[in-house]
């Protein structure tokens, strides 16, 4: 993997920093594991905008990634590593001994030809998935389930990982990258190692158009709007003089947004500042 800084041959190239991975497959993805993906433009079934700043962008196919890792005790060989436009991490196409192919998240250090396995008896090495009751304390894991059999939900983006710091009864305690410590059922499955492509955070798009290719539209400041459009709008010149809020009047600085009291008991320590 290489970090490439583009030459300033134009204003749009001047600040571009690319992450180039020569190991990635250059051909087409594996067709049976593709699904169609339609653009919504951030609108719901009524045609109303429910998520701002979404629209346009390159057409994409969704890759059916195996987050459950429920093909147990059958070894698989990594056929190739691929780019996935739907996530920051790369994915790996693996071929199981029974002939089935699946996509999985590509962990750090996984290469073409490596063997992976899921199940209670799987060895502790990158890419193998097993219940957390069978994983030693102190191990770094990713693609962690919150409910047994539901599929991984925690630590799935590029460079992400979670550390198992304790095991007590039916629960294990995890330390997340945010600093939060939470309990999860020990029966939940996790994959050993951290997600690959950690250099993703070093890339620089360099121009607004690169964001438009990704389907991201501009964000207009509230103070640049009219009073009818935003609480910050209007006034002669740059008037503000109030606490910053969202377009719907909700405070933006420091207001707590979590409303899931049912699972509060599983959080041992809140994330750090």
Curated annotation (Swiss-Prot):
Renumbered residue ranges of the record's region Disordered: 31-50, 221-273
Superkingdom assignment: Bacteria
Pfam families: Ribosomal_L2, Ribosomal_L2_C
GO molecular function (one): structural constituent of ribosome
InterPro entries named in the record: NA-bd_OB-fold (IPR012340), Rib_uL2_dom2 (IPR014722), Ribosomal_uL2 (IPR002171), Ribosomal_uL2_bac/org-type (IPR005880), Ribosomal_uL2_C (IPR022669), Ribosomal_uL2_CS (IPR022671), Ribosomal_uL2_dom3 (IPR014726), Ribosomal_uL2_RNA-bd_dom (IPR022666)
Gene Ontology cellular-component terms listed: large ribosomal subunit
Gene Ontology terms describing biological process: cytoplasmic translation
The keyword Iron is annotated on this UniProt entry: no
UniProt cross-references to SMART domains, sorted A to Z: Ribosomal_L2, Ribosomal_L2_C
Signal peptide feature range: none
Biased composition (Basic residues): 253-273
PROSITE patterns tied to this protein: RIBOSOMAL_L2
Alphabetic keyword roster: Ribonucleoprotein, Ribosomal protein, RNA-binding, rRNA-binding
Assembly: Part of the 50S ribosomal subunit. Forms a bridge to the 30S subunit in the 70S ribosome.
Function noted in UniProt: One of the primary rRNA binding proteins. Required for association of the 30S and 50S subunits to form the 70S ribosome, for tRNA binding and peptide bond formation. It has been suggested to have peptidyltransferase activity; this is somewhat controversial. Makes several contacts with the 16S rRNA in the 70S ribosome.
Family stated for the protein in its record: Belongs to the universal ribosomal protein uL2 family.
Name used for this protein in its record: Large ribosomal subunit protein uL2
Source organism (scientific name): Actinobacillus pleuropneumoniae serotype 5b (strain L20)
């Amino acid at each position: 993997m290489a970090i490439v800084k583009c030459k300033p041959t134009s204003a749009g190239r001047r600040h571009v920093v690319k992450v180039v991975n020569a190991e990635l497959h250059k051909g087409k993805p594996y067709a049976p594991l593709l699904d169609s993906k339609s653009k919504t433009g951030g609108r719901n079934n009524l045609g109303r905008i429910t998520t701002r700043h979404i629209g346009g962008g390159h057409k994409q196919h969704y890759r059916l990634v195996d987050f459950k890792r429920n093909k147990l005790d059958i070894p698989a060989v990594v056929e190739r590593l691929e780019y996935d436009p739907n996530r920051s991490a790369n994915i790996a196409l693996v071929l199981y001994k029974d002939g089935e192919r699946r996509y999985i998240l590509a962990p750090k250090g996984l290469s073409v030809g490596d063997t992976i396995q899921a199940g209670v008896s799987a060895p502790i090495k990158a890419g193998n998935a097993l219940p957390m009751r069978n994983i030693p304390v102190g191990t770094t894991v990713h693609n962690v389930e919150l409910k047994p059999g539901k599929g991984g939900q925690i630590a799935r983006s590029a460079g992400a990982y979670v550390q198992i710091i304790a095991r007590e009864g039916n629960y294990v305690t995890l330390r997340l990258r945010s600093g939060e410590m939470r309990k999860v059922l020990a029966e939940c499955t996790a994959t050993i190692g951290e997600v690959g492509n950690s250099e993703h955070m070093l890339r620089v798009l360099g121009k607004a158009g690169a964001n438009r290719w990704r389907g991201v539209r501009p964000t207009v400041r509230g103070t640049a709007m009219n009073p009818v459009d935003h609480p910050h709008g209007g006034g002669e010149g740059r008037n503000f003089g109030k606490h910053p809020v969202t377009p719907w009047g909700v405070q933006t600085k420091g207001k707590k947004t979590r409303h899931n009291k049912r699972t509060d008991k599983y959080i041992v320590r809140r994330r750090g500042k």
